Amino acid sequence: MSVSAIRIPANGSSAKAAVIFLHGLGDSGDGWSWLPQLVSQSKLINDPINYVFPNAPKIPVTINNGFAMPAWFDIYELGNPHAKQDVTGFFKSCEVLKEFILEQHNKFNIPLEKIIIGGFSQGAAISLATLALLDTKIGGCVALSGFCPVRNEITDRYNKNPGVNFDTPIFQGHGTVDPVINYDYGKQTSELYKQLGFKNLKFNTYEGVAHSASEEELADVIKFIKNIVEK
């Protein structure tokens, strides 16, 4: 499966790092294309960065009465970790993200340790899982309002073939009043990945924030990116 993407190349000179960020259900890459401008306005990061915002394919989504919408995998029941899950679609999207990582490394000569993957909601779920399954070490992972709908499958795959990113920095952020992906579901997801052995995962709580990214959370994300890009 190949997908299109919004690409915002580094300004002025060759990129030294890359951020690949996956949107949530029903959104598009364009929905997060403002992120580079926010990073620039912060004046915290000087190194040039390639930004890639992939577009999920339009697929029939069960909670949308079967009508097609942009989605990284089908959802049968919103926010329920025990519901039926689209395991096949989920792992297909993980493979797509792997392809974008390799593209940045092979085509643009970005060091793997300077590549950060991430996403919001569905995109966060894919990013966390992909990090667990990679056989190459990368720079970091950002998971905003994320979850893990394939808990058993991730555990089984990881135990059979542990990845190499067990000490890779992971930023997970979640609002306490998220009505879509419950805060506790996000917290359980962080505990799952910690149990798998990801010792450099930090779960960040944002009081009063719903299913969105607050200014405080985004400021923390920029600092996280800076620490990886400029180390």
Curated annotation (Swiss-Prot):
What keywords does the record list, in alphabetical order? Cytoplasm, Fatty acid metabolism, Hydrolase, Lipid metabolism, Nucleus, Serine esterase
Q: In the UniProt record, does the keyword 4Fe-4S occur?
A: no
A single Gene Ontology CC annotation of this entry is:
cytoplasm
Per UniProt, what is one GO molecular function of this protein?
Answer: palmitoyl-(protein) hydrolase activity
Q: Which reaction does it catalyse?
A: S-hexadecanoyl-L-cysteinyl-[protein] + H2O = L-cysteinyl-[protein] + hexadecanoate + H(+)
- Subcellular location per the Swiss-Prot or TrEMBL entry: Cytoplasm; Nucleus
Q: What is its EC number?
A: 3.1.2.-, 3.1.2.22
Record bears the keyword Magnesium = no
Q: Where is the active site?
A: 121 (charge relay system), 178 (charge relay system), 211 (charge relay system)
Q: Which InterPro entries match?
A: AB_hydrolase_fold, LYPA1-2/EST-like, PLipase/COase/thioEstase
Q: Which SUPFAM superfamilies did the record assign?
A: alpha/beta-Hydrolases (SSF53474)
Q: Which domain of life is it from?
A: Eukaryota
Q: Which GO terms describe its biological process?
A: fatty acid metabolic process
Q: Mention any Pfam family matching this sequence.
A: Abhydrolase_2
Give the enzyme's main class according to its UniProt record, as a single word. hydrolase
Q: Which family does it belong to?
A: Belongs to the AB hydrolase superfamily. AB hydrolase 2 family.
Name the job this protein performs.
Hydrolyzes fatty acids from S-acylated cysteine residues in proteins with a strong preference for palmitoylated G-alpha proteins over other acyl substrates. Mediates the deacylation of G-alpha proteins such as GPA1 in vivo, but has weak or no activity toward palmitoylated Ras proteins. Has weak lysophospholipase activity in vitro; however such activity may not exist in vivo.
Record's protein name: Acyl-protein thioesterase 1
Q: Which organism is it from?
A: Candida albicans (strain SC5314 / ATCC MYA-2876) (Yeast)
